[in-house]
Protein backbone atom coordinates (compact mmCIF):
# COMPACT_ATOMS: atom_id res chain seq x y z
CA UNK A 1 0.00 0.00 0.00
CA UNK A 2 1.37 3.43 -0.94
CA UNK A 3 2.12 6.08 1.65
CA UNK A 4 -1.38 7.12 2.68
CA UNK A 5 -0.19 10.36 4.27
CA UNK A 6 1.08 11.66 0.94
CA UNK A 7 -2.14 10.55 -0.72
CA UNK A 8 -4.11 12.30 2.00
CA UNK A 9 -2.38 15.63 1.39
CA UNK A 10 -3.04 15.48 -2.34
CA UNK A 11 -6.78 15.05 -1.78
CA UNK A 12 -7.38 18.05 0.48
CA UNK A 13 -9.65 20.70 -1.00
CA UNK A 14 -12.36 23.18 -0.01
CA UNK A 15 -16.03 22.18 0.12
CA UNK A 16 -16.78 24.27 -2.97
CA UNK A 17 -13.91 22.70 -4.90
CA UNK A 18 -15.18 19.24 -3.95
CA UNK A 19 -18.71 19.99 -5.18
CA UNK A 20 -17.26 21.12 -8.52
CA UNK A 21 -15.90 17.57 -8.93
CA UNK A 22 -19.42 16.09 -9.02
CA UNK A 23 -21.10 18.56 -11.36
CA UNK A 24 -21.92 15.76 -13.82
CA UNK A 25 -23.46 13.49 -11.19
CA UNK A 26 -27.01 12.23 -11.67
CA UNK A 27 -27.55 10.60 -8.26
CA UNK A 28 -25.77 11.13 -4.94
CA UNK A 29 -26.28 10.24 -1.29
CA UNK A 30 -25.21 11.49 2.12
CA UNK A 31 -24.03 9.85 5.30
CA UNK A 32 -26.99 8.80 7.44
CA UNK A 33 -28.28 10.97 10.31
CA UNK A 34 -25.26 12.35 12.21
CA UNK A 35 -22.84 11.12 9.52
CA UNK A 36 -24.24 13.71 7.14
CA UNK A 37 -21.71 16.49 6.61
CA UNK A 38 -23.41 19.86 6.96
CA UNK A 39 -20.29 21.48 5.50
CA UNK A 40 -20.77 19.52 2.28
CA UNK A 41 -24.55 19.76 2.02
CA UNK A 42 -24.36 23.52 2.50
CA UNK A 43 -21.71 23.71 -0.23
CA UNK A 44 -23.95 21.63 -2.48
CA UNK A 45 -26.81 24.10 -2.08
CA UNK A 46 -24.45 27.04 -2.45
CA UNK A 47 -23.33 25.64 -5.82
CA UNK A 48 -26.79 24.50 -6.89
CA UNK A 49 -26.61 26.10 -10.33
CA UNK A 50 -24.13 23.38 -11.32
CA UNK A 51 -26.99 20.87 -11.26
CA UNK A 52 -30.23 20.12 -13.03
CA UNK A 53 -32.58 17.82 -11.07
CA UNK A 54 -29.73 16.06 -9.28
CA UNK A 55 -31.27 13.12 -7.42
CA UNK A 56 -30.41 13.07 -3.72
CA UNK A 57 -31.32 9.64 -2.32
CA UNK A 58 -30.92 8.96 1.38
CA UNK A 59 -32.74 8.29 4.65
CA UNK A 60 -32.97 10.36 7.82
CA UNK A 61 -31.30 13.75 8.14
CA UNK A 62 -30.76 15.97 11.17
CA UNK A 63 -29.37 18.84 9.08
CA UNK A 64 -31.10 21.82 7.46
CA UNK A 65 -32.10 19.78 4.37
CA UNK A 66 -32.30 22.92 2.21
CA UNK A 67 -31.79 20.72 -0.85
CA UNK A 68 -35.30 19.34 -0.25
CA UNK A 69 -37.04 22.73 -0.32
CA UNK A 70 -39.33 23.65 -3.20
CA UNK A 71 -37.23 26.72 -3.98
CA UNK A 72 -34.36 24.39 -4.90
CA UNK A 73 -36.42 21.87 -6.90
CA UNK A 74 -35.05 23.16 -10.20
CA UNK A 75 -31.62 21.90 -9.13
CA UNK A 76 -32.30 18.94 -6.83
CA UNK A 77 -34.89 16.19 -6.61
CA UNK A 78 -35.01 14.58 -3.21
CA UNK A 79 -35.69 10.84 -2.99
CA UNK A 80 -36.40 9.77 0.59
CA UNK A 81 -36.02 6.15 1.66
CA UNK A 82 -37.13 7.23 5.13
CA UNK A 83 -38.75 10.56 5.92
CA UNK A 84 -37.89 13.05 8.64
CA UNK A 85 -39.40 16.43 9.56
CA UNK A 86 -37.23 18.44 7.14
CA UNK A 87 -37.91 16.20 4.11
CA UNK A 88 -41.58 15.32 4.73
CA UNK A 89 -43.01 18.10 2.60
CA UNK A 90 -40.86 17.22 -0.41
CA UNK A 91 -41.63 13.50 -0.15
CA UNK A 92 -45.36 14.23 -0.32
CA UNK A 93 -45.13 16.75 -3.15
CA UNK A 94 -44.69 16.83 -6.91
CA UNK A 95 -41.06 17.94 -6.53
CA UNK A 96 -39.85 15.04 -4.37
CA UNK A 97 -40.12 11.28 -4.09
CA UNK A 98 -40.40 8.47 -1.57
CA UNK A 99 -39.02 4.97 -2.20
CA UNK A 100 -40.49 2.21 0.01
CA UNK A 101 -37.87 -0.20 1.32
CA UNK A 102 -36.85 -2.23 4.34
CA UNK A 103 -33.85 -0.72 6.12
CA UNK A 104 -31.70 -3.84 5.74
CA UNK A 105 -32.09 -3.67 1.95
CA UNK A 106 -30.73 -0.13 1.60
CA UNK A 107 -27.11 -1.31 1.54
CA UNK A 108 -27.91 -3.42 -1.52
CA UNK A 109 -29.84 -0.60 -3.21
CA UNK A 110 -26.76 1.64 -2.96
CA UNK A 111 -24.41 -1.15 -4.08
CA UNK A 112 -22.41 -1.03 -7.31
CA UNK A 113 -25.10 -2.87 -9.26
CA UNK A 114 -27.97 -1.71 -7.08
CA UNK A 115 -31.10 0.01 -8.25
CA UNK A 116 -29.83 3.24 -6.63
CA UNK A 117 -26.15 3.03 -7.59
CA UNK A 118 -24.43 6.33 -6.86
CA UNK A 119 -22.28 8.75 -8.76
CA UNK A 120 -21.11 10.34 -5.52
CA UNK A 121 -21.24 9.91 -1.75
CA UNK A 122 -20.81 12.81 0.70
CA UNK A 123 -20.18 12.10 4.38
CA UNK A 124 -18.11 12.86 7.46
CA UNK A 125 -15.73 10.43 9.13
CA UNK A 126 -13.25 10.34 12.00
CA UNK A 127 -9.62 11.35 11.74
CA UNK A 128 -7.45 8.52 10.34
CA UNK A 129 -5.48 6.19 12.56
CA UNK A 130 -1.79 5.45 12.03
CA UNK A 131 -2.66 3.04 9.23
CA UNK A 132 -4.90 5.46 7.34
CA UNK A 133 -8.27 4.06 8.41
CA UNK A 134 -11.12 6.39 9.31
CA UNK A 135 -14.14 5.22 11.27
CA UNK A 136 -17.62 5.93 9.93
CA UNK A 137 -18.27 6.95 13.50
CA UNK A 138 -21.98 7.41 13.95
CA UNK A 139 -23.59 5.56 11.06
CA UNK A 140 -22.39 2.40 9.36
CA UNK A 141 -25.80 1.23 8.04
CA UNK A 142 -26.04 1.94 4.27
CA UNK A 143 -23.28 4.55 4.61
CA UNK A 144 -20.53 1.93 4.29
CA UNK A 145 -21.99 0.30 1.17
CA UNK A 146 -22.66 3.66 -0.45
CA UNK A 147 -19.11 4.83 0.25
CA UNK A 148 -17.54 1.62 -1.04
CA UNK A 149 -19.54 1.65 -4.26
CA UNK A 150 -20.00 5.30 -5.25
CA UNK A 151 -17.94 6.52 -8.20
CA UNK A 152 -16.70 9.55 -6.23
CA UNK A 153 -16.36 9.80 -2.43
CA UNK A 154 -16.05 13.16 -0.69
CA UNK A 155 -15.39 13.04 3.05
CA UNK A 156 -15.16 15.65 5.74
CA UNK A 157 -12.48 14.62 8.23
CA UNK A 158 -13.83 15.72 11.59
CA UNK A 159 -12.05 15.26 14.92
CA UNK A 160 -15.41 15.29 16.71
CA UNK A 161 -16.57 12.09 14.98
CA UNK A 162 -15.99 9.20 17.41
CA UNK A 163 -13.83 6.28 16.39
CA UNK A 164 -16.40 3.52 16.70
CA UNK A 165 -15.28 -0.05 16.19
CA UNK A 166 -16.68 -3.02 14.27
CA UNK A 167 -16.99 -3.41 10.50
CA UNK A 168 -16.97 0.33 10.33
CA UNK A 169 -13.86 1.69 8.58
CA UNK A 170 -12.87 3.31 5.31
CA UNK A 171 -9.26 3.83 4.20
CA UNK A 172 -7.97 7.16 2.97
CA UNK A 173 -7.10 5.48 -0.34
CA UNK A 174 -10.83 4.90 -0.90
CA UNK A 175 -11.70 8.57 -0.46
CA UNK A 176 -11.30 10.83 -3.49
CA UNK A 177 -11.55 14.30 -1.96
CA UNK A 178 -10.99 15.42 1.63
CA UNK A 179 -12.27 18.44 3.52
CA UNK A 180 -10.57 19.12 6.85
CA UNK A 181 -13.15 20.77 9.07
CA UNK A 182 -13.94 20.16 12.73
CA UNK A 183 -17.61 20.77 13.43
CA UNK A 184 -19.58 19.62 16.50
CA UNK A 185 -21.75 16.55 15.96
CA UNK A 186 -25.52 17.16 16.10
CA UNK A 187 -26.98 15.93 19.36
CA UNK A 188 -30.43 14.37 19.57
CA UNK A 189 -31.90 14.68 23.03
CA UNK A 190 -34.21 11.91 24.30
CA UNK A 191 -37.94 12.63 23.97
CA UNK A 192 -40.06 13.53 26.97
CA UNK A 193 -41.74 10.49 28.53
CA UNK A 194 -45.30 11.11 29.70
CA UNK A 195 -47.53 9.03 31.95
CA UNK A 196 -49.02 7.09 29.02
CA UNK A 197 -45.59 6.17 27.67
CA UNK A 198 -44.52 5.22 31.17
CA UNK A 199 -47.40 2.74 31.48
CA UNK A 200 -46.66 1.29 28.06
CA UNK A 201 -42.98 1.00 28.93
CA UNK A 202 -43.83 -0.89 32.10
CA UNK A 203 -46.00 -3.38 30.18
CA UNK A 204 -43.25 -3.88 27.58
CA UNK A 205 -40.60 -4.43 30.24
CA UNK A 206 -42.78 -7.10 31.88
CA UNK A 207 -42.23 -9.28 28.79
CA UNK A 208 -38.43 -8.95 28.98
CA UNK A 209 -36.62 -11.75 30.82
CA UNK A 210 -33.12 -11.89 32.26
CA UNK A 211 -30.67 -12.74 29.48
CA UNK A 212 -32.85 -11.49 26.61
CA UNK A 213 -31.30 -9.61 23.69
CA UNK A 214 -33.11 -6.38 22.81
CA UNK A 215 -33.83 -4.12 19.90
CA UNK A 216 -35.50 -0.80 20.62
CA UNK A 217 -36.74 1.66 18.03
CA UNK A 218 -36.95 5.45 18.11
CA UNK A 219 -39.25 7.51 20.32
CA UNK A 220 -40.62 8.05 23.81
CA UNK A 221 -41.85 4.47 24.29
CA UNK A 222 -38.43 2.80 23.85
CA UNK A 223 -36.98 5.38 26.25
CA UNK A 224 -39.72 4.51 28.74
CA UNK A 225 -38.99 0.80 28.37
CA UNK A 226 -35.35 1.32 29.30
CA UNK A 227 -36.42 3.00 32.55
CA UNK A 228 -38.16 -0.21 33.64
CA UNK A 229 -35.30 -2.60 32.90
CA UNK A 230 -33.04 -1.65 35.79
CA UNK A 231 -33.90 -4.80 37.77
CA UNK A 232 -33.06 -7.15 34.87
CA UNK A 233 -29.82 -9.10 34.52
CA UNK A 234 -27.46 -9.87 31.66
CA UNK A 235 -29.46 -8.22 28.89
CA UNK A 236 -27.94 -7.96 25.43
CA UNK A 237 -28.23 -5.44 22.59
CA UNK A 238 -28.57 -6.21 18.89
CA UNK A 239 -30.39 -3.13 17.62
CA UNK A 240 -30.38 -0.84 14.64
CA UNK A 241 -29.59 2.07 16.97
CA UNK A 242 -27.97 2.73 20.33
CA UNK A 243 -29.14 5.68 22.43
CA UNK A 244 -28.11 7.32 25.70
CA UNK A 245 -30.46 5.09 27.69
CA UNK A 246 -28.63 1.97 26.60
CA UNK A 247 -25.34 3.44 27.84
CA UNK A 248 -26.98 4.07 31.21
CA UNK A 249 -27.98 0.39 31.50
CA UNK A 250 -24.50 -0.75 30.48
CA UNK A 251 -23.02 1.40 33.25
CA UNK A 252 -25.50 -0.08 35.74
CA UNK A 253 -24.44 -3.60 34.80
CA UNK A 254 -27.92 -4.46 33.47
CA UNK A 255 -26.68 -4.84 29.90
CA UNK A 256 -23.68 -7.18 29.79
CA UNK A 257 -24.22 -8.93 26.43
CA UNK A 258 -22.94 -12.14 28.06
CA UNK A 259 -25.86 -14.34 27.02
CA UNK A 260 -25.86 -13.51 23.32
CA UNK A 261 -25.25 -16.33 20.84
CA UNK A 262 -23.96 -13.90 18.24
CA UNK A 263 -21.34 -11.22 19.02
CA UNK A 264 -21.25 -12.01 22.76
CA UNK A 265 -19.95 -9.34 25.14
CA UNK A 266 -20.65 -6.60 22.60
CA UNK A 267 -23.58 -4.26 21.98
CA UNK A 268 -24.25 -4.36 18.24
CA UNK A 269 -25.90 -1.57 16.25
CA UNK A 270 -25.81 0.03 12.83
CA UNK A 271 -26.00 3.69 13.94
CA UNK A 272 -25.79 5.87 17.04
CA UNK A 273 -28.20 8.69 17.86
CA UNK A 274 -28.09 10.67 21.07
CA UNK A 275 -26.02 13.17 23.02
CA UNK A 276 -22.31 13.83 23.44
CA UNK A 277 -22.39 11.41 26.38
CA UNK A 278 -23.18 8.58 23.96
CA UNK A 279 -20.61 9.67 21.39
CA UNK A 280 -17.88 9.92 24.01
CA UNK A 281 -18.78 6.51 25.43
CA UNK A 282 -18.67 4.83 22.02
CA UNK A 283 -15.31 6.36 21.09
CA UNK A 284 -12.72 3.58 20.75
CA UNK A 285 -14.84 1.37 23.03
CA UNK A 286 -14.72 -2.36 22.16
CA UNK A 287 -17.96 -2.91 24.11
CA UNK A 288 -19.89 -1.29 21.23
CA UNK A 289 -19.59 -2.23 17.58
CA UNK A 290 -21.25 -0.79 14.48
CA UNK A 291 -21.86 -3.03 11.49
CA UNK A 292 -23.54 -2.52 8.10
CA UNK A 293 -27.33 -2.59 8.02
CA UNK A 294 -27.45 -5.68 5.81
CA UNK A 295 -25.86 -7.51 8.74
CA UNK A 296 -27.46 -5.88 11.78
CA UNK A 297 -30.98 -5.69 10.34
CA UNK A 298 -30.94 -8.94 8.39
CA UNK A 299 -33.74 -11.07 9.89
CA UNK A 300 -31.68 -14.24 9.43
CA UNK A 301 -28.81 -12.70 11.42
CA UNK A 302 -31.15 -11.28 14.07
CA UNK A 303 -32.73 -14.70 14.61
CA UNK A 304 -29.37 -16.24 15.50
CA UNK A 305 -29.63 -14.65 18.95
CA UNK A 306 -31.94 -16.72 21.14
CA UNK A 307 -34.56 -14.83 23.17
CA UNK A 308 -34.50 -11.82 20.87
CA UNK A 309 -37.06 -9.17 21.83
CA UNK A 310 -37.89 -6.31 19.45
CA UNK A 311 -39.86 -3.28 20.66
CA UNK A 312 -41.17 -0.81 18.09
CA UNK A 313 -43.78 1.94 17.91
CA UNK A 314 -46.76 2.33 15.59
CA UNK A 315 -49.29 4.89 14.44
CA UNK A 316 -52.29 2.54 14.14
CA UNK A 317 -53.21 -1.11 14.54
CA UNK A 318 -56.41 -2.49 13.01
CA UNK A 319 -58.54 -5.25 14.48
CA UNK A 320 -56.87 -7.88 12.28
CA UNK A 321 -53.47 -6.97 13.73
CA UNK A 322 -52.15 -5.03 10.74
CA UNK A 323 -49.72 -2.27 11.71
CA UNK A 324 -49.36 1.18 10.18
CA UNK A 325 -46.12 2.76 11.38
CA UNK A 326 -45.51 5.27 8.58
CA UNK A 327 -48.63 7.07 7.30
CA UNK A 328 -50.62 9.97 8.83
CA UNK A 329 -53.49 12.05 7.40
CA UNK A 330 -53.13 10.63 3.88
CA UNK A 331 -49.42 11.45 3.81
CA UNK A 332 -46.22 9.47 4.08
CA UNK A 333 -44.93 10.41 7.53
CA UNK A 334 -41.78 8.30 7.92
CA UNK A 335 -41.16 4.77 6.61
CA UNK A 336 -40.90 1.20 7.82
CA UNK A 337 -37.30 1.75 8.91
CA UNK A 338 -36.10 -1.41 10.60
CA UNK A 339 -39.43 -2.40 12.15
CA UNK A 340 -40.23 -5.30 9.83
CA UNK A 341 -36.60 -6.46 9.82
CA UNK A 342 -36.67 -6.92 13.59
CA UNK A 343 -40.27 -8.11 13.86
CA UNK A 344 -39.38 -11.01 11.59
CA UNK A 345 -35.95 -11.63 13.08
CA UNK A 346 -37.27 -11.65 16.65
CA UNK A 347 -40.16 -14.00 15.93
CA UNK A 348 -37.81 -16.36 14.08
CA UNK A 349 -35.51 -16.39 17.11
CA UNK A 350 -35.73 -19.29 19.57
CA UNK A 351 -37.71 -17.86 22.49
CA UNK A 352 -38.03 -14.52 20.70
CA UNK A 353 -40.82 -11.94 20.89
CA UNK A 354 -41.88 -8.98 18.81
CA UNK A 355 -43.71 -6.10 20.49
CA UNK A 356 -45.60 -3.27 18.77
CA UNK A 357 -46.34 -0.52 21.29
CA UNK A 358 -48.51 2.58 20.90
CA UNK A 359 -50.73 4.94 22.90
CA UNK A 360 -54.40 4.04 22.55
CA UNK A 361 -55.39 7.49 21.22
CA UNK A 362 -54.10 10.59 19.50
CA UNK A 363 -55.51 14.07 18.94
CA UNK A 364 -55.80 14.73 22.69
CA UNK A 365 -57.84 11.58 23.14
CA UNK A 366 -60.28 12.24 20.29
CA UNK A 367 -58.99 9.63 17.84
CA UNK A 368 -58.50 5.92 18.52
CA UNK A 369 -55.28 4.37 17.31
CA UNK A 370 -56.84 0.93 17.54
CA UNK A 371 -59.13 1.01 14.50
CA UNK A 372 -61.59 -1.35 12.86
CA UNK A 373 -59.85 -0.99 9.51
CA UNK A 374 -57.38 1.40 7.91
CA UNK A 375 -58.58 4.20 5.66
CA UNK A 376 -58.21 3.71 1.93
CA UNK A 377 -54.61 4.18 0.79
CA UNK A 378 -52.97 3.56 4.16
CA UNK A 379 -50.03 1.15 3.71
CA UNK A 380 -49.49 -1.86 5.94
CA UNK A 381 -46.03 -1.70 7.54
CA UNK A 382 -46.10 -4.95 9.52
CA UNK A 383 -48.55 -7.52 8.24
CA UNK A 384 -51.08 -9.38 10.35
CA UNK A 385 -49.09 -12.52 9.59
CA UNK A 386 -46.02 -11.09 11.33
CA UNK A 387 -47.56 -9.41 14.36
CA UNK A 388 -46.90 -10.94 17.79
CA UNK A 389 -47.62 -8.68 20.80
CA UNK A 390 -49.45 -5.33 20.72
CA UNK A 391 -49.32 -3.09 23.80
CA UNK A 392 -51.11 0.11 24.80
CA UNK A 393 -51.39 1.81 28.18
CA UNK A 394 -54.40 -0.47 28.80
CA UNK A 395 -52.59 -3.76 28.51
CA UNK A 396 -51.04 -6.48 26.39
CA UNK A 397 -52.64 -8.32 23.45
CA UNK A 398 -50.83 -11.47 22.32
CA UNK A 399 -52.01 -12.01 18.73
CA UNK A 400 -49.72 -14.68 17.32
CA UNK A 401 -51.67 -17.86 16.63
CA UNK A 402 -55.01 -16.15 17.29
CA UNK A 403 -58.00 -16.15 14.92
CA UNK A 404 -59.29 -12.88 13.48
CA UNK A 405 -62.22 -13.01 15.90
CA UNK A 406 -59.88 -13.57 18.85
CA UNK A 407 -57.60 -10.77 17.70
CA UNK A 408 -60.46 -8.31 17.46
CA UNK A 409 -61.57 -9.16 21.00
CA UNK A 410 -58.05 -8.80 22.43
CA UNK A 411 -57.34 -5.52 20.66
CA UNK A 412 -60.65 -3.98 21.73
CA UNK A 413 -59.73 -4.81 25.32
CA UNK A 414 -56.58 -2.65 25.07
CA UNK A 415 -58.26 0.18 23.13
CA UNK A 416 -59.25 3.34 24.97
CA UNK A 417 -62.53 2.77 26.88
CA UNK A 418 -64.20 5.65 25.00
CA UNK A 419 -63.90 3.73 21.72
CA UNK A 420 -64.48 0.14 22.77
CA UNK A 421 -68.25 0.08 22.23
CA UNK A 422 -67.95 1.49 18.71
CA UNK A 423 -65.23 -1.04 17.89
CA UNK A 424 -67.34 -3.89 19.31
CA UNK A 425 -70.31 -2.91 17.12
CA UNK A 426 -68.18 -2.92 13.98
CA UNK A 427 -66.50 -6.17 14.96
CA UNK A 428 -69.91 -7.78 15.62
CA UNK A 429 -71.05 -6.80 12.11
CA UNK A 430 -68.04 -8.61 10.67
CA UNK A 431 -67.50 -11.55 13.01
CA UNK A 432 -70.68 -11.95 15.00
CA UNK A 433 -70.32 -12.59 18.72
CA UNK A 434 -66.75 -12.08 19.94
Regions found by a protein language model. Give the residues of each.
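Conserved alpha/beta enzyme-core scaffold
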Residues: 1-434
Amino acid sequence: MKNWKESYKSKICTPDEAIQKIKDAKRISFGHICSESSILTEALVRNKKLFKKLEIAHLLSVGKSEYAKEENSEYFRHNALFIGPKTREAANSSYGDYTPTFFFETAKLFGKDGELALDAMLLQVSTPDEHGYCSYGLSCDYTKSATENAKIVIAQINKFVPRTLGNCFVHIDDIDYIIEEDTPIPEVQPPVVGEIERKIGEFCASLVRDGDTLQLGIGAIPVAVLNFLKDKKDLGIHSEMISDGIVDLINLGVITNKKKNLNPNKAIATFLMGSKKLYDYANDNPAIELHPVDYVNNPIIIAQNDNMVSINSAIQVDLMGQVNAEYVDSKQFSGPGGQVDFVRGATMSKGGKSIIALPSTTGKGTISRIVFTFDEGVPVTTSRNDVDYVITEYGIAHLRGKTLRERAKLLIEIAHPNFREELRKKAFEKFGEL
